[in-house]
Amino acid sequence: MSASSLLEQRPKGQGNKVQNGSVHQKDGLNDDDFEPYLSPQARPNNAYTAMSDSYLPSYYSPSIGFSYSLGEAAWSTGGDTAMPYLTSYGQLSNGEPHFLPDAMFGQPGALGSTPFLGQHGFNFFPSGIDFSAWGNNSSQGQSTQSSGYSSNYAYAPSSLGGAMIDGQSAFANETLNKAPGMNTIDQGMAALKLGSTEVASNVPKVVGSAVGSGSITSNIVASNSLPPATIAPPKPASWADIASKPAKQQPKLKTKNGIAGSSLPPPPIKHNMDIGTWDNKGPVAKAPSQALVQNIGQPTQGSPQPVGQQANNSPPVAQASVGQQTQPLPPPPPQPAQLSVQQQAAQPTRWVAPRNRGSGFGHNGVDGNGVGQSQAGSGSTPSEPHPVLEKLRSINNYNPKDFDWNLKHGRVFIIKSYSEDDIHRSIKYNIWCSTEHGNKRLDAAYRSMNGKGPVYLLFSVNGSGHFCGVAEMKSAVDYNTCAGVWSQDKWKGRFDVRWIFVKDVPNSQLRHIRLENNENKPVTNSRDTQEVPLEKAKQVLKIIASYKHTTSIFDDFSHYEKRQEEEESVKKERQGRGK
């Protein structure tokens, strides 16, 4: 076949060019010079154009690659600028990836990414003898021509162009249908399942591999370093050596190494050790606080015994013994230092009398020596009543059984006290004083009755949860007199009273009685000097008179006597400093 006949048969869209340079009539070349390049196999595939035109359709989607081997003859560009030579990416063979390399930057990857007729991808600069003039034999780690043709194929992270990752030499036991480094990953996953660092150390390392075996090994060691890290310092030779060691040594080593040896979180046994040794590692101040709570709880447990004695035995003996035992109360003692400390240490949500405290309220120790005095009093004077209380009992008939609660004429008021100290002194001196507004209301009620009926006062301490007694108003209010015996000096005026009932009646016994003159609220939810209608007052008086009480302020009478003496001594000291 002659060159002229071939040129005449070319399509019109193609120029009179052949690969690797222009050919014209004037060059004087013979027809035989084109025989190696013009074979009959090129006729069925006339879709590709000259290789120098890298941006023609053959750059993107030619049907097939070259039909001849590059090893037949050396190439020449004919003086043209060196351009990369590309072939098609057609069918996949031998499991190689299908992608389009970047043609304009001369990557040393494969010339044709898809092999033809079972051959591997051709390298642009293979190190064979046919291309010895094009490059160095030691370039890009390609030692022999066989290795260049058999194992040098590229893997690109993207489907079109981009930076390519050089193909690596396959392992001895690695087939061509696996990407380089897959066996390394498989062995690394096996090492993770086994949970041992020995398998990771046997993983083969490939220099420059895209998936570095060193990183896998380090990850395996890091993931498995948590349990073995604690055993690494002793390094036993066999399992028998490990079994011969004490069982409790390894948790201790784990705890120390987990804290100071590494940055990893401590093993779960670390928390178990903390739970077991919480009492030893706790703050030192916690032990005194627990001891204080236990000491405070002791008089609380001792108080129910006098309660039982009061119910079964004679009231004076029981009341005296309880009065010696329970001594704390909310009103401030005369000593400011003790007051500030004790009130901060024990502030209940609701005030309850010390005798009725039980274990639910920790209002002990308003008096600095309350706990010690209660224990000493219970052992030293269990049967000796206070002389003042004995005198009061002899004069007054408290808690009478023949009380006439069915009133025909009379008025009843609720009295709310700030503290039981004032209740104690009201019983002791048979006097009372209310607020300025309360005094006017009580005085008007007393004067309105004019002896036609009694004026009863139902006493209750704020926040106590019970009524502590009933007294009868015996005189009008004297606004010009100041008693000077109350826990606070702000009260002015005074009137005489006579105490009839001295007992603790819980609010639960009276809560069902509602007052129509106070928004239909329970009688237990009343303010100071709140008047109770006569019919409702009869119900209240009946319940209080018939209620079988177990506690009263008489149980703490000795305690309040001592508090009063302390307050009087403090007042005298203040008066002496003021002079």
Swiss-Prot record:
Residues the record lists as binding RNA: K416, S417, Y418, D422, W432, C433, N462, W486, W491
Outcome of mutating K416A: Decreased binding to RNAs
Up-regulation conditions: Following heat shock stress.
Gene3D superfamilies linked: ph1033 like domains
Modified residues (N-acetylserine): S2
Gly residues: bias regions: 359-371
Region (Disordered): 1-45, 247-387
Effect of W432A: Reduced binding to N6-methyladenosine (m6A)-containing RNAs. Reduced ability to undergo liquid-liquid phase separation. Reduced binding to C5-methylcytosine (m5C)-containing RNAs
Protein name: YTH domain-containing family protein 2
Organism whose genome encodes this protein: Homo sapiens (Human)
Gene that encodes the chain: YTHDF2
